[in-house]
Amino acid sequence: MTTGNFFREQYPKKFMGIDGKSMAYIEEGIGDPIVFIHGNPTSSYLWRNIIPHVGHLGRVIAPDLIGMGDSDKLDNTGPANYKFEEHCKYLYKLFENLDLSNVHFVIHDWGSALGFYWTQLNPKRVKSITYMEAITGPIESWQDWPEVARNIFRAFRSDAGEELILEKNIFVERILAGDGKLSEEDLEIYLAPYKIPGEDRRPTLTWPREIPIAGEPNYMVAIAESYAEFLSKSDIPKLFINADPGSILVGNQREKVRLWNNQREVTVKGGHFVQEISPDDIGGHLADFIASFK
């Protein structure tokens, strides 16, 4: 396993100004871009043990979403901030400035929604998509959400969410750290952007409120429906890395994506943060998939 210090030495962060804010990202290598997008509440550090498997195959790019990782926080934030549309604005401008084409996406959690939507908007610029524990479309009801997480996610979407996350930091300290697989060093790196109670933690609260579930929020349901319909028919090559037992891409959601066009499927061990459990298996499958385009 790659240590935090070694990873940061081998893949130092770069920074780019986007609308007055600094976006952090990793960029190493040459060739077609291999773009890793994390979700909530992680950062590009999520990919530390997977990136080395494919570094020789292209130009590795791994951003920290706005307000997360080493990217800047937004100013004067509240419940209206860090929504999907706002993340799109910053991330997609970064992509434009990096002049991306022939992209191999590697995406997880909310990073998947951001990558899927960009693919729908820019299909001729995407060469392949690898996804795991992803938001592959609207979730019809709470019965399709993991039972162990149902009550807490409903609480996040209620008035109790501010206390649970902005004050108690539940998403990072309980959900991410909950399986006990992270070292103290790894957990400290993930915790760093959210040390200060209050608005610094806002991204990790807004994200669960954006999940398109049981018809809400309406605009996210529409976006997820749209990209799911596009991806189900698109001939863009896809690699579905199925997590066993998994967490959110299970049951009905998993059966739906198994019908997507031009797709391979492999299975690795892990729950939602599968990169922390099976990075070498993921890295091996990813390397084989990307190498097949050479």
Question: Each PLM stretch: what is its role?
Answer:
Residues 2-14, 18, 22-26, 33, ...:
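Flexible "cap/lid" subdomain of the alpha/beta-hydrolase fold that forms the substrate-access gate
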Residues 39, 277-278:
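Active-site helix-initiating loop/hinge in glycosyltransferases
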Residues 40-51:
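The serine-hydrolase catalytic nucleophile loop
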Residues 55-64:
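Active-site machinery of serine-nucleophile hydrolases
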Residues 282:
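Histidine-centered active-site loop/cap adjacent to the catalytic His
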